[in-house]
């Protein structure tokens, strides 16, 4: 395993640990999710380029589309929650309330 793959795996792991440990604010959770998506994109792109898989070359682009949709939905949810409740604490949110 080359050092670039190890760096991307460590970036994914650190983002996952950040999501698990620092989930008090919604903004920090969204940033950790974006870090995970970025490291997955770079890893998939490097693997596809190194193995010369031409049929799978659209998969990183599809992942970026899903990451952009996730970011847009997350930011709109963050704006809605912060204007409604005045805070973005994840622990104080109860999504089952009307």
UniProtKB/Swiss-Prot annotation:
Its EC number is 7.1.1.2. The chain crosses the membrane at residues 1-21, 29-49, 61-81. InterPro entries: NADH_UbQ_OxRdtase_chain4L/K (IPR001133), NUOK/Mnh_C1-like (IPR039428). Gene3D superfamilies: 1.10.287.3510. GO terms for molecular function: NADH dehydrogenase (ubiquinone) activity. Keywords: Electron transport, Membrane, Mitochondrion, Mitochondrion inner membrane, NAD, Respiratory chain, Translocase, Transmembrane, Transmembrane helix, Transport, Ubiquinone. GO terms for biological process: ATP synthesis coupled electron transport. GO terms for cellular component: mitochondrial inner membrane; respiratory chain complex I. It holds the Pfam family Oxidored_q2. It is a multi-pass membrane protein. It is found in: Mitochondrion inner membrane. It catalyses: a ubiquinone + NADH + 5 H(+)(in) = a ubiquinol + NAD(+) + 4 H(+)(out). Core subunit of respiratory chain NADH dehydrogenase (Complex I) which is composed of 45 different subunits. Belongs to the complex I subunit 4L family. Core subunit of the mitochondrial membrane respiratory chain NADH dehydrogenase (Complex I) which catalyzes electron transfer from NADH through the respiratory chain, using ubiquinone as an electron acceptor. Part of the enzyme membrane arm which is embedded in the lipid bilayer and involved in proton translocation. This is NADH-ubiquinone oxidoreductase chain 4L. It comes from Platyrrhinus dorsalis (Thomas's broad-nosed bat).
């Amino acid at each position: 395993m080359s050092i670039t793959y190890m760096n991307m795996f460590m970036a994914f792991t650190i983002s996952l640990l950040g999501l698990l440990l620092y989930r008090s604010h919604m903004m920090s959770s969204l940033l950790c999710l974006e870090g995970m998506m970025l490291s997955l994109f770079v890893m998939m792109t490097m693997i596809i380029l190194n193995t010369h898989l031409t049929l799978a070359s659209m998969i990183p682009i599809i992942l970026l589309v899903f990451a952009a949709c996730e970011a847009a939905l997350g930011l709109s949810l963050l704006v809605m929650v912060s204007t409604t409740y005045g805070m973005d604490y994840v622990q104080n949110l109860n999504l089952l309330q009307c």
